[in-house]
Amino acid sequence: MAANQRYRKPLPGTDLEYYDARAACEDIQAGSYDKLPYTSRILAENLVNRADKVDLPTLQSWLSQLIEGKQEIDFPWYPARVVCHDILGQTALVDLAGLRDAIAEKGGDPAKVNPVVQTQLIVDHSLAVECGGYDPDAFRKNREIEDRRNEDRFHFINWTKTAFENVDVIPAGNGIMHQINLEKMSPVVQVKNGVAFPDTCVGTDSHTPHVDALGVISVGVGGLEAETVMLGRASMMRLPDIVGVELTGKRQAGITATDIVLALTEFLRKERVVGAFVEFFGEGARSLSIGDRATISNMTPEFGATAAMFAIDAQTIDYLKLTGRDDAQVKLVETYAKTAGLWADDLTTAVYPRVLKFDLSSVTRNMAGPSNPHARFATVDLTAKGLAKPYEEPSDGLMPDGAVIIAAITSCTNTSNPRNVVAAALLARNANRFGLKRKPWVKTSFAPGSKVAEIYLKEAGLLSEMEKLGFGIVAFACTTCNGMSGALDPKIQQEIIDRDLYATAVLSGNRNFDGRIHPYAKQAFLASPPLVVAYAVAGSIRFDIENDVLGVSDDGKEIRLKDIWPTDEEIDAVVAEYVKPQQFRDVYVPMFDTGKAQKAPSPLYDWRPMSTYIRRPPYWEGALAGERSLTGMRPLAILPDNITTDHISPSNAILAASAAGEYLAKMGLPEEDFNSYATHRGDHLTAQRATFANPKLFNEMVKNEDGSVRQGSLARVEPEGETMRMWEAIETYMNRKQPLIIIAGADYGQGSSRDWAAKGVRLAGVEAIAAEGFERIHRTNLIGMGVLPLQFKPGTNRHTLQLDGTETYDVVGERKPRGDLTLVIHRKNGETVEVPVTCRLDTAEEVLVYEAGGVLQRFAQDFLEGNAA
């Protein structure tokens, strides 16, 4: 008998069964289940549920890791769903289409390559805000441009839903994946073959933890790891660090969920919760709506964690009802949660290895920036921080210093929270009543993550107020938050260039890394939706938003922020009256009623040879199919701390003078249709030219005459010592077949779950990366591409080793999970230094993937050997 059958029991009050993880844990140690944190209880159920092919001792060895809080052995995790946006989701499916070709060429059956786990792809990353919210026809124009630019991509995506099994596609113009996941796709409790079990999910975006707010373990992964899960493989893991965060107190009047999450992000970054599963509990957590919780969970990657969990409680049930879920499903969620010990009241006995406390009443009105989401500051401190200065608007009609050139209400972080959206709309209404206007140089936009926002704002009579101030709906997509802010007015852009202006962006997004939002917005600031509206009126980051005068009313009254900020009571009254279950049903029932798609005539995609968007991937051929020597490697770059995936493989608009822009011009694309780096990631010939193409990069191998590090997408080719553009350096090394290494500081690879940040360096010939530390998703992606992550021991770094880029490097030793290896450094003067480093292949499975050359090579081997899942 399978190890788990003894724990399969009837679910009370239903005709379903469930796996009793409590009983399985109690069989090992009495009273153990009550002490488990929420995360461990979900993981325990997943282990018991999927233990149909292992014996009881094996199952108990896995459960013992949870009970004893140990991190000694790997255990499998099988997520129930994979959610994708069109960039990484498309890239993953391009890989699977390429895998089909590779299998067919070796005599295998390509039709067997299919996702076996439910895979949901939402097209939300492709739309650029070319027309701002002051254009009444902006939505139509932006969608038409999106369709024209992305015809190749959308052709492929439409093919996938007919060619692959278990793939659902939500086409462009319908919303953001995380918000749709929250409002519709996640059932919280799944049912399969008569068994109820917790919904779990991985997504090809670092903000996938958005639905952790519902009590669903939902984590961001790279496209390569998503492919592993799609194909039914276990995601091998060790028990993560689990940190309890007790939320106390009650927020002050006028404080939004955005203010709370920016304060929490600063707090949790300082507390170093990197890679941890954070669990919120306490009276403060209970008081937060699901909208507020989702705003917090969404920014999980910004505070460095893997997940940000809230247990299921009455707020969860109320939200499921509000969003139009079926009554039977809502009842099942409550029944299952209370039976399985997942109801918040059952978590009072949970024991956390580490507990932090955060007082909600301490939160003031906040912003974050520039450059980092955890760089929080209170708006009352703008002057003290040196941002706000005595402000006088230029009388000559020119832009002021610190001009806000983009003000965007964007991102599922905030638009999935009706309270934040309504607050912005009410502030816009109040501003209109006093005759306030947006400044003419501010490109304003409103891009909700759900069509429901449009309905409740219309019914409340508030959408017209937003439109009057320039915040008409430009899209239901990610837009500015993922760098798709679109072109500026040419006159405004030229003025920025001619006057070398310090121009900025203010957005309600979740990231503000340098260069991400727009090439001409030197810095960006995160703020709540109502503050975004206020800054559109103010027009400059130098404006003291709390104290300076926004305008003068008809009767001569000076209008400040406090005069237009809506009360909590007014916000709550609008939400209570105008946000209704039927609105969600009206949006989502037709969206998901896709009918029966006709099956594609061939399992193989007919690649378009001139496409710059979709191209057969090269991962099973040429140099990538060969051995990695890990000897004689030269450094492509020596990099500082906090290198993000935006530095490694940017997402924003492709400029004509860039390597990718020059390539696209040669391929015959007009400059206005270059689109973004992100949209071209299905074509490796375009995408690899994005590698380290961020103009904000600091490669410490490239110096100015005064010895300071020179900024730009630059590299120094050795042994000649010649400085050139990064892409030319990569081409030079590729032609020489020169193996490469990257040396970096702490927190390498933070930010978006961007598999091209790993693919790009591997295609360049990088075989290893030695850093002081890695962000979780990027480290996994590197392994998935066959790049070896190495971590310096504490106290050792590029500075202590006095590295200058003239060295060559070898890696010596047997690769074992977190074992010691030796980085052998050969200096130019003939000296050799041996440096112990940690092999950051953290699990036995990761070692196997690396040795195979990466996950794609591993898949091909398994399918050809008949070991496919």
List each model region and its residues.
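Conserved phosphate/anionic-ligand binding catalytic regions in large, soluble enzymes, centered on
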Residues: I87-L96, P198-E225, S289-I312, S371-P373, ...
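Extracellular/luminal Protease-associated
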Residues: F281-L288, N510, E731-E775
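N-terminal amphipathic, basic-rich helices that act as targeting or association modules
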Residues: M1-E144, L288-N298, E302-D326, P609-S649, ...
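Long, structured ligand/cofactor-binding scaffold of large enzymes
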Residues: D52-L247, T258-L262, R365-A368, D381-A477, ...
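Acidic, glycine-rich flexible loop/linker segments
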Residues: S553-E570, V574, H778-V849, L864
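Mobile "lid/hinge" segments at catalytic clefts and subdomain interfaces of large enzymes
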Residues: T39, K192-K331, W343, A428-P440, ...
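Short glycine/threonine-rich loop-to-helix capping motif typified by GTGT followed
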Residues: C131-Y134, L288-S297, L320-A328, T415-V421, ...
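Terminal amphipathic helices with adjacent charged low-complexity linkers/tails
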Residues: Y78, A97-D152, F280-A388, E546-D606, ...
